[in-house]
A protein has these predicted regions:
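A charged, low-hydrophobicity C-terminal interaction/regulatory region common to genome-maintenance complexes
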Residues: 7-13, 22, 92, 199, ...
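Basic, amphipathic alpha-helical bundle interface domains used for macromolecular binding and assembly
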Residues: 113, 121, 141, 147, ...
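Conserved ASCE/P-loop NTPase catalytic core
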Residues: 1-185, 298-303, 307-321
Length: 322
C-alpha cells in the first residue's frame, strides 16, 4: 500500500507537534493523538462488556482508515506497543483478540512525533541512535518509510527571536486540500510508473542498499525500493502529475530522483548521522578494510612514481576534508 509511516524524533520545544498540528488544521485533514493520554486500546481498539454482550470499540487508527493519524509524544508507547502495532503498520489491518475477536481495515497514514527517550539529542554521537533507544526491535524500525531527526541546535537562536514576514501562499487552502484528497483517493491501479521511473527506483535502491548499515534498518537493500516508490508518489501527487483527465497519477523519473534527494538530505544531515554512522561501520568492517587497502595499493601502483601519487593526494580537497 502506498501509505506513509514516518517518525520525527528530536529535542523538546523544537516545534514538532506545533508544526504537525498546524498543518493538520490548515489542510483540514488527519487527527492528532497524544500518546501520553491514550492507551493502546485507544489507538487500536478494545473489548468492553455491556450486559451479557461483548462489543469492540475501535481506536483512533482504524477509525481514520485511509486518513492520517499523528501520534504525539510517541515515547510514551512501550516496546510491546510498537510490536502490537506491527500488523497495522505492515498490512493495514487492526485486530482485537479478547473474549471476542474482530478485524477491520486500518490503512492509515501514520506520523509519530517523539522526544529521545531519556537524553538530549546532543548526547548522541549520531542522532539516529536515539531510534534504537526508543524502539528496541529492528523490525519495528524497519517499518518506517523514513525517519527525521531534529535538534534545538540546528537553527541559530538569532533566527528564531526576530520578526518574520507573513507567509504568502501560492495556492488557496481549498485547492491544497483538494489535491491531498485526490491523491488519497487513488487506488493502486490508478498509480502508474513510467519505465524510466522503475529503472531509476532500482538504480537508487541498489546504491542506497549497498551503502547504509542494516544495523539500523531504515534502509535495507531488500525493500528500500518500496520506500523510494512511496516518496516518489508523494512528489508526483504534489506536482499533480496526472494523466487521462486526472484519473491516473503518473510517477516519472524526475519524481524518483526527488525522492532520492529527499532521503539523502535527511540521512546526510549532521544531526541525523545515519550516513556518517554507516560510513563508520564500513570502515570497521575487516573485509571492507582489506578491499580498501587493496584498492589503494592498486591506485598507487597506477602512478609512474610515488611522488606523483602523494602530490595528488595532498592537493585533493576531498581527501583533506575526510
Amino acid at each position: 500500500p502506498a501509505r506513509m509511516d514516518a517518525i520525527i524524533i528530536g529535542d523538546t520545544r523544537c516545534g514538532k507537534g506545533h508544526v504537525a498540528e498546524g498543518l493538520s488544521k490548515y489542510y483540514g485533514i488527519g487527527e492528532v493523538v497524544g500518546a501520553e493520554n491514550c492507551s493502546f486500546a485507544g489507538l487500536v481498539g478494545g473489548a468492553q462488556q455491556i450486559g451479557n454482550h461483548w462489543l469492540i470499540s475501535w481506536g483512533r487508527i482504524p477509525l481514520n482508515d485511509r486518513g492520517l493519524v499523528i501520534v504525539d509524544e510517541a515515547s510514551e508507547l512501550g516496546s510491546t506497543d510498537w510490536t502490537r502495532l506491527s500488523r497495522i503498520r505492515s498490512e493495514g489491518i487492526a485486530e482485537v483478540t479478547k473474549i471476542v475477536q474482530q478485524v477491520t481495515n486500518a490503512r492509515t497514514r501514520l506520523l509519530f512525533l517523539t522526544n529521545p527517550p531519556s537524553k538530549a539529542m546532543s548526547n548522541y554521537t549520531f542522532g539516529v541512535h536515539a531510534l534504537k533507544d526508543l524502539i528496541h526491535a529492528p523490525e519495528d524500525i524497519a517499518r518506517f518509510d523514513y525517519a527525521c531527526v531534529v535538534s534545538h541546535e540546528e537553527v541559530p537562536i538569532e533566527n528564531i527571536n526576530k520578526k518574520h514576514k507573513l507567509t504568502t501562499f501560492l495556492h488557496p487552502q481549498y485547492a491544497e486540500r483538494e489535491l491531498i484528497m485526490w491523491t488519497w483517493s487513488r487506488s493502486s491501479d490508478q498509480i502508474i510508473f513510467t519505465e524510466d521511473a522503475v529503472n531509476e527506483i532500482f538504480k537508487v535502491a541498489n546504491r542506497l542498499g549497498k551503502f547504509y548499515d542494516i544495523g539500523i534498518p531504515l534502509i535495507q537493500g531488500e525493500n528500500v525500493r518500496f520506500k523510494i516508490a512511496k516518496v516518489a508518489i508523494a512528489y508526483a501527487s504534489r506536482l499533480y502529475s496526472a494523466a487521462q483527465d486526472g484519473s491516473i497519477l503518473k510517477v516519472r523519473r524526475l519524481h524518483v530522483q526527488c525522492a532520492a534527494t529527499f532521503l539523502r538530505s535527511l540521512y546526510r544531515a549532521d544531526v541525523h548521522g545515519y550516513y556518517d554512522h554507516s560510513w563508520q561501520q564500513k570502515e570497521l568492517n575487516p573485509a571492507l578494510q582489506k578491499e580498501n587497502i587493496d584498492a589503494l595499493i592498486a591506485y598507487f601502483n597506477a602512478y609512474h612514481s610515488q611522488d606523483d601519487a602523494y602530490s595528488y593526494l595532498l592537493n585533493n580537497t576531498y581527501v583533506q576534508s575526510r
